[in-house]
Amino acid sequence: MNTTTSRWTSLTRVALAGVCVALAACSGPSRPKPTEIQGVPVLQDMRTSWTANVGKVDFPLVVSAREDRVALANSQGVVAVLDATTGKDVWRLKLDQAISAGVGSDGQQLAVVTRNNELVTLQDGKVQWRKSLPAQSFTAPLVAGARVFVLTADRSVIAFDGATGRQLWTQQRPGEPLVLKQAGVMLAVKNTLVVGLSGRLSGLDPNTGVIRWESAIATPRGTNDVERLVDLVAPFDRVGDVVCVRAFQAAVGCVNAELGKGVWTRPSAGEMGVSGNDTLLVAPLSNGVVQAFNRSNGERLWDTERLKYRILSAPLVTPRGVLVADNGGWLYLLSLADGALLNRIKLDSEELATAPVFAGGRYVVVTREGRVTGFQMP
């Protein structure tokens, strides 16, 4: 898969009726060839525990990791919950429609959005209810507080009753005429629904949809709609009340979601989301350079060019290091201290479909071909 092209063709224009029309691929200079990596020292063991298959994934998948289970889906409508310790199915169900966004879950109820703009909730391998949406969605629904929240491509946030599917409220914010066909940002912080709307994090009342606060991560600039695109992209990183995010090709930053105030922002030209811990935040750039920032103040801690010119996945910061994959099917482990390469393993010939997750004592990755791998780092 040509990832660079697919990311540009993933831009869609939202018409007034909420219909998205795909744009043609944008041309640009050819990407320099990455330097061959040879003689990687094994400074941290990475052991494969199990492999499984979910089927091809060509939508912005989000894997929901809860305790010892992971919930995931493929493009053709299969939704599955796996035991993260063994890779075995807890349950698996084939829907009658292809999937465009998911999986959202609170550990019990799951939610996905189909390409026919239908929100579908499931529990224990059975469909609970379905509701039509006014527009496409590329962001996994948020299941929280007995509600299901959806962020649609026309930048509307819609809340549904989790038990019945009854629509509770809708909130729409004006934005740029383009939207990414990429998972956005939506999470619950205490009694606030936090949503990425254009280049801002917005805090909404989950009961009414009223906006309580907004904090800018990036401001649209440029001479055309593509250059002005600064949507916030998944994955985000949360520690306590502070949520850190990336604005597409513009910046990274952190916001105190309890106070509704920005903590810091820094320029950062990347396309994928971020990951961090109590002290640092890791954010790959579009050119394959990986950067780490001080989480409290945004100061640059380190960057590494070891993976330069590779097309990288979103990262996962672990106690053992930073996991990040490239479009050639390699999974790398980088040092938390300085970004040095600690190990790499071959997963598949394809890129990852989403960022790695942790559940059941295993790190779980999913490739575009649908290969699911669980591994440990003893």
Label each region the model flagged.
Residues N2-L16:
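Bacterial N-terminal signal peptides that target proteins for export
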Residues A22-A25:
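C-terminal motif of bacterial Sec signal peptides marking the signal peptidase cleavage site
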Residues P29-S64, W91-G107, Q128-A144, Q167-K190, ...:
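Extracytoplasmic beta-rich repeat domains
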Residues N74, T114-R115, T152-A153, G196-S198, ...:
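Structural signature of WD-repeat beta-propellers
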Residues A80, V120-T121, I158, S202, ...:
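WD40 beta-propeller blade core
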Residues D83-T86, Q123-K126, D161-T164, P206-G209, ...:
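Short loop/turn segments that connect beta-strands within beta-propeller blades
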Residues L280, P284-A292, E299-L333:
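Loop/turn-rich, solvent-exposed surfaces of beta-rich toroidal or solenoidal domains
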